[in-house]
């Protein structure tokens, strides 16, 4: 399985439910498994001051809040839940340089804390690792070549040493493609190629106005084209979950009517 996030967890659960008892190899650049949801008392801190901080200050504050919560037997997950409603504002109030630092150094660690899985599924992943039925590899896939009934994977590990695996099948669990220029959807390629649209901040998704209207290559807003969901990640960051999608869909419907 290529990728170690939520899609990987779903894939492993599906394989186990279908009776697969062989070894599962999971490969990703950071080899980080999603962390579990937790039950317990909610954290009672005010996250609003985070909005005035830079990236380094925010990360330090969150670690301190999580540590303080732990002294009262409050799970760190509740701290993350407190900042959940501020997701888009937290992204938009970072400087461009801090956003770039986040994408380069923080995002993988953020994702496993922010996008979590059910505790029983997390326990299942740990048990599979413990019994060596799930092996986690930190590396970057380079080639995948079919050889008879098998697929031979060639990768580069964290120390840039070659890593080879021979498997029966490969599952792409890398999730949503965020890089605009790497998107293979013909419509999106045409929008970008013709200048009707342009890549969003940091080359992620499509550039949009605050109301979701598409922005073209010249910076002109096109209100007749409304953008929703993962294509707005560059502008909003939090743009995948149901609450955000519901709000964007309502705004698009209002614009259309």
What positions do the PLM features span?
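Flavin (primarily FAD) cofactor-binding/catalytic cores of flavoenzymes
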Residues: 1-56, 60-257
């Amino acid at each position: 399985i290529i990728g170690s996030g939520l899609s990987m967890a779903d894939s492993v659960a599906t394989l186990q439910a279908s009776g697969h008892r062989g070894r599962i190899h999971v490969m990703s650049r950071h080899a980080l498994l999603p962390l579990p949801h937790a039950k317990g008392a909610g954290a009672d801190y005010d996250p609003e001051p985070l909005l005035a901080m830079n990236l380094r200050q925010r990360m330090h504050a969150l670690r301190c809040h999580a540590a303080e919560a732990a002294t009262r037997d409050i799970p760190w997950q509740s701290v993350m839940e407190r900042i959940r409603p501020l997701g888009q504002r937290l992204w938009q109030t970072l400087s461009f340089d801090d956003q770039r630092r986040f994408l380069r150094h923080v995002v993988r660690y953020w994702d496993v804390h922010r996008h979590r899985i059910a505790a029983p599924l997390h326990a299942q992943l740990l048990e599979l690792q413990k019994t060596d039925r799930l092996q986690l590899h930190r590396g970057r896939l380079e080639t995948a070549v079919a050889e008879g009934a098998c697929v031979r994977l060639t990768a580069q590990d964290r120390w840039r040493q070659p890593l080879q695996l021979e498997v029966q099948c490969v599952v792409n669990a890398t999730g949503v493609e965020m890089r605009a220029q790497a998107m293979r959807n013909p419509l999106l390629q045409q929008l970008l190629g013709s200048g009707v649209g342009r890549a969003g901040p940091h080359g992620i998704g499509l550039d949009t106005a605050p109301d979701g209207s598409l922005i073209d290559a010249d910076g002109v807003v096109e209100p007749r084209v409304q953008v929703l969901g993962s294509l707005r990640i560059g502008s909003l960051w939090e743009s995948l979950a149901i609450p955000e999608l519901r709000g964007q869909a309502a705004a698009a419907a209002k614009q259309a009517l």
